[in-house]
Regions:
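Surface-exposed loop/edge segments in extracytoplasmic proteins
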Residues: 81-88, 323
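Long, contiguous ectodomains of secretory-pathway proteins
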Residues: 1-84, 103-104
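Feature responds to low-complexity, polar/acidic, surface-exposed segments characteristic
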Residues: 103-128, 136, 141-157, 164-190, ...
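A short amphipathic alpha-helical interaction element
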Residues: 131-134, 159-163, 195, 224, ...
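Short strand-edge motifs at loop-to-beta-strand transitions and within beta-strands
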Residues: 96-98
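Extracellular beta-strand-rich, repetitive "passenger/adhesive" scaffolds
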Residues: 318-321
């Protein structure tokens, strides 16, 4: 709960205009709202503060034809017209809205990042929007100025870097090297040290991390569960448990993590109801998992509705159950 009240709560979203060059560049003609919460008691309205709590907000929006949903953001506009990009925001296609978590009520709008590299290898890929999502938020970079390499394997060093950036880790806080195979000047070095120190990922031995080794899908599940747990996130059980056709091939140490991440809607199966536990986790799959994680943190119910599995195939979930056959109202 946001707060203890004895009256009715009303969330007000008032369209507003903010004039500054920074707002014009970030938001343009997209919606901007002054968002407030009020308690109504005995006919009197009183403004409500979050007082250290958070609230999930959705701003309805239909992307323009030239806009990529993965590049849409929620932005906060302060009293001086300065824009703060909210990295933990996402355009949810099922809700047709930009969703985000607010720590205070204020002026919020919808921003768009135009400066995303024009990758030549993502246009026809099922995870295109997810890849643009992670790049626009600085979680992952392209493999060149024009390529993302969606089907290339995700290395341990790359993965912990993305997670560290998502967590807002300050690299200067983790400069002391913990592993002999992690060079101090490697881009992933501080994030490896952070991940090992916090228990998100262990080394392959006491002195090695194997940063250039690809992770497989069951390892990705374990790391994501560790990440959520260590950072204090609640892992929801939104979806029914899936009995994958290859469940017997999931390692005993990964079974609980696979189940947990699948029920939360963070990881999914692939073609023919397989999980492919030993298959290499690709950059496209990791981008998809990171975006799902952000959306689940904002609103666990984003696991319902139309969703793609980890092969890009669409399914529909209602109240946590997979809907089979024709859909009707």
């Amino acid at each position: 709960p946001i707060c203890q009240t004895t009256g009715d709560l009303i969330l007000k979203m008032k369209k507003t205009a903010v004039t500054s060059q920074e707002v014009e560049t970030a938001i343009g003609n997209r919606p901007v709202y002054d968002i407030t919460l009020w308690e109504v008691k005995n006919g009197k309205e009183t403004a409500v503060n979050l007082s250290g709590k958070t609230v999930s907000i959705a701003i309805p929006y239909t992307p323009a034809k030239n806009e990529q949903p993965g590049n849409l953001y929620a932005v906060y506009v302060d009293e001086n017209g300065n824009v703060q990009w909210i990295s933990k925001s996402s355009y949810n296609m099922d809700q047709k809205a930009v969703i985000f978590v607010a720590e205070h009520f204020s002026i919020y709008g919808i921003g768009y990042k135009n400066q995303i590299p024009a990758f030549t290898d993502v246009n026809n890929h099922w995870a295109k929007d997810n890849m643009l999502f992670v790049v626009s938020r600085g979680l992952l970079s392209g493999t060149s100025a024009t390529t993302f390499s969606p089907n290339t394997g995700m290395t341990r060093g790359m993965f912990v870097t993305a997670l560290g950036r998502l967590a807002g880790v300050d690299p200067t806080d983790y400069q002391a090297s913990m592993f002999t195979d992690v060079k101090e000047d490697a881009y992933y070095a501080p994030y490896v040290n952070w991940a090992a120190k916090t228990g998100v990922v262990s080394g392959t031995t006491d002195t090695t991390f194997a940063p250039d080794t690809n992770i497989n899908r069951e390892q990705m599940a374990v790391i994501m569960k560790n990440y959520a747990t260590k950072l204090g996130y609640t892992i929801p059980k939104t979806l029914e448990v899936v009995n994958f056709a290859d469940s017997a091939g999931i390692s005993s140490w990964a079974k609980e993590a696979v189940k947990s991440m699948q029920q939360a809607g963070i990881l999914a199966g692939k073609t023919n109801n397989c999980f492919d536990p030993a298959g290499t986790a690709t950059r496209a799959e990791v981008a998809t998992v990171l975006r799902r994680f952000v959306e689940i943190v904002i609103d666990p119910q984003t696991a319902n509705g139309w969703v793609q599995n980890d092969s890009g195939e669409w399914s529909y979930y209602k109240n946590g159950d997979l809907v089979k056959g024709w859909l009707s109202n």
